[in-house]
Amino acid sequence: NDTHSHFDETALPLRLALLDGACDIRLHCGGFPRLASFIKQARQRAISEQMPLFLLDAGDSFQGTLYFSCFKGQANAALLNQLGIDAMVVGNHELDTGNAPLANFLRQIRFPLLAANWDLSAEAEDKPTRMQDHPLMVSWQNPAHPKPYIVKWVDDVPVAIFGLVLENMQDIAAPDGDSQFLPVVETAKTIIEQIHADGIEHIILLSHLGFPRDCQLAQEVDGISLIVGGHTHTLQGDFGALGLADEHPYGERFNRTLVLHAGYNSLMVGLAEVSLLPEGQMRIEQGGNVLLTSETALLQSQQGEPLPAPQQRTIRRFLRNQRHVAMLQPDSAMERLLANNYRAKLRHYASDQVVSLPRGLRHVRIPDERGGSQVAPLVAEAMLFQAREMGVPVDVAIFNAGGARISLPPGPVSAAELAGRLLPFASTISHFEVRGGQLRLALEGAIVNALELGGSGSFPYPADLRYSYHASAPRGQRVRQLHVKDRTGRWQLFDEQRDYRLITTSYTAMGKEGYHALLNQRSEPELLGLIISDAFINYARSRGILTPPQDALYQLNFDQLVS
């Protein structure tokens, strides 16, 4: 689940609990060649023991790296086909840029795409990216696939598998306007009744709702044997010896329902051997999540320096003895597919040095005791820069913190790092006029969403705009002391009655995650004509050296929270 186009290995920071003390390292892990190798071994074992094997993907294959930015899902389809996926549920990032990329993906895959609570019946008959009539689209009332589930067999026992997607998809992604997402609980109950009426007791839910919601759903809805889920990047199992968060035990049971999640970014994979019990129940006989690496995987210090040979031998011996680590040779067929069809086309990004950093730039979503993001305000500045370079007279910019994904280390930074890791989402940029009072309310809504409603990615980082936030003030009056920087570089008082031309991501412009006041636009949003990573690369290249922003653009005051 949540592989996010991480087809190549990742340098993962670990803190190993060695006998002589903790050891901080970076280990190259994961990637689809290792994933393919693990799956091939699991299939061979299943065949030898005469057991079926179901390979399920819990969504969010899209976005995350240059592989998606450049190939728009084509590489995802080819690599998932190569793995031999049995079914995949639709994740929210599959719909970040509308239905079209997923519709094209659907035409290339050889496995069913599950989304039982996605109603596509309003699609026009002549819509070029219509999915409603596709036989692999297992959605709500699709005439090409009348039942909203698929059936697999364990010997002579049928097992039904259906998928559920986030019912608030319109709020956190950008599906087409003809898409409707039905309530999760009611849909689940309806489908389970239908499955039982068809004489099937054992039911697997392939979910992209997130771990807390999966656990809640298991307690609210009877009849689900097993949930395989994604969305929250939850890693079940005890990975404490590797310094990874020990979040939840593997295969927790809620109301007779087992719940399985397997991390993120193709770093891990879960394998569970499950017995079918009477009355639709299942029991895990053995299994768990494992971190994928190799005997010869690159080992470095946290600073990226080589480790002495004796220390490397000690660490590799330690890793071999960890039951949650799989040491695998990458699969040669998957490696060839990547190398010959996709990796070579991305090579120029890695060799294109865009900018240099005298010091690292830290990124956090919500400001903490060390301050806020040093990256996100620069992205906001980049949108202003790019618009003004193109002759668009914008006044202020806002960038939501969740759009940036990593901190930047000191030294030279490549286009691959910026477009593939820092700003991996192919977000377009919009500009439009909005009344000052609505802009102030949008800032407040985004901050409330970040601080009180769990949506940390919405926190607003501005450019040429500054504000203070007072948590103890009544709703609607929390954002104060706003100023706007004019073209001479002087700060001017913010005017609530004036129209300002705002530039932001198209995602934010749609009023997502607390920014709903931006929907009260005074002019139609216009696209700038390029994506956020391109704007940032152009901005960074023009500066040559990036340093943290000098202006204090926001102040947070927490006397007490008032809801």
Identify the role of each PLM range:
Residues N1-T293, V375-A382, A397-F399, E433, ...:
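Acidic, metal/ion-coordinating pockets
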Residues H4, T10-C23, Q353-P367, F425, ...:
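Acidic/histidine-rich, surface-exposed loop or edge segments in extracytoplasmic proteins
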Residues H6, L12, P112, S121-A122, ...:
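Feature captures C-terminal
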Residues S37, Q41-Q44, N104, T190, ...:
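Charged/polar, solvent-exposed surface patches and flexible loops
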